[in-house]
Amino acid sequence: MAATTTLRSPKIPHPPPESTPSNLSYLSQISLTPVPKRRRFISIYACSNAESNSQFGSEIKKSQAIELNKVSDEHPYEFNSKDSPNPLPRPLTSADLSNMATEGSRLRVAYQGVRGAYSESAAEKAYPNCEAVPCEQFDTAFEAVERWLVDRAVLPIENSLGGSIHRNYDLLLRHRLHIVGEVKLAIRHCLLANNGVKIEDLKRVLSHPQALAQCENNLTKLGLVREAVDDTAGAAKYIAFQQLKDAGAVASLAAARIYGLNVLAQDIQDDSDNVTRFLMLAREPIIPGTDKPFKTSVVFSLDEGPGVLFKALAVFAMRNINLTKIESRPLQKQALRVLDDSADGFPKYFPYLFYVDFEASMADQRAQNALGHLKEFATFLRVLGSYPSDSGIA
């Protein structure tokens, strides 16, 4: 029978805010409010070294699912660790936070995917010696941080070949997490297969859609049918647990080691300069400084009108602030706006949110002046984070 531990969620006093620029607002309080008489599952995987021959998608011990069940007001939260020897640690309390520096507690860092994912490598690069906690979905990682189940999340935001991860841009706006850093990781894809399987035996290859797209030319030369799955390491785990002889996986060297697969070919990506940028997310912003290169990320919306976007970008140019990225996303729940100011018809346009990264710290007066200027004509403005830039690629 699965061991069940019921934890009541304490009201956690929020740490007193320190002196920061006004653009970086702190959350007033963290509390976990249960939904009465309704069950909701958040699947977070807790890693285990136990061996298992279970099929992919069933209850497996190498990467065991932890279910967080909202059951009622009387029993706010239950953790069901199905035969897992390493259940997810309890949520942090304010006492935990104060003891972390003195006792050397390991940070718990959420990432999307299963063990062997590139995101796991990014989490370990961002926070060496951390306890990496795999999550089933991007949403789960955001919620895990907000609910104090983990301390940080490291999630991809863009790839040099595949472009932006639009889902995570939308989640940044829906949640109140702060960007506290970035990490860039070189992506080196490998073609993996089970023991005894040769390249000529393969008929199909499984991986994440972006990984398949990044290796398109090489996979086409091999004549392999491409099948998309949720993540690269998940593909490796699937062919290993199913003992497939006609299928390979595009994944990392780490995934090959974890799931006992042979590496048939290395560096099969079409472009050797394949880099993914990950964001480091936390419940609280960091205090920006000027002692090292900083980057600031903001999101804003604008009213309609000629030259409005030009004016918005000009507030940075006139202060000699370099923009490193601009991304537009349709405004949720307002996908289409109709104007009736013309007798000839109803002009339609899509209102957009603009995500901008620029090279300046919020401790820099230029950045504060630029955002103050932008706020004069922006209909919405939010600072997502001001954090040290990552210039190194590993």
From Swiss-Prot:
Native source organism of the sequence: Petunia hybrida
GO cellular component: chloroplast; chloroplast stroma
Pathway: Amino-acid biosynthesis; L-phenylalanine biosynthesis; L-phenylalanine from L-arogenate: step 1/1
Tissue specificity note: Expressed at low levels in petals (corollas and tubes), stems, leaves, pistils, stamens, ovaries and sepals.
Residues covered by the Prephenate dehydratase domain: 108-283
Organism taxonomic ancestry: Eukaryota, Viridiplantae, Streptophyta, Embryophyta, Tracheophyta
Purpose: Converts the prephenate and L-arogenate produced from the shikimate-chorismate pathway into 3-phenylpyruvate and phenylalanine (Phe), respectively. Involved in floral volatile benzenoids and phenylpropanoids (FVBP) production.
Presence of the UniProt keyword Zinc-finger in the record: no
Record's keyword terms, sorted: Amino-acid biosynthesis, Aromatic amino acid biosynthesis, Chloroplast, Lyase, Phenylalanine biosynthesis, Plastid, Transit peptide
Principal subcellular localisation of the protein: plastid
Region (Disordered): 1-24
Enzyme Commission identifier(s): 4.2.1.91, 4.2.1.51
Enzyme class of the recorded protein, top EC level: lyase
Keyword Amino-acid biosynthesis: yes
The protein's name: Arogenate dehydratase 2
Transit peptide endpoints, chain numbering: 1-47
Pfam family, one: PDT
InterPro entries: ACT-like_dom_sf, ACT_dom, Preph_deHydtase, Preph_deHydtase_CS
Reaction(s) this enzyme catalyzes, per UniProt: prephenate + H(+) = 3-phenylpyruvate + CO2 + H2O; L-arogenate + H(+) = L-phenylalanine + CO2 + H2O
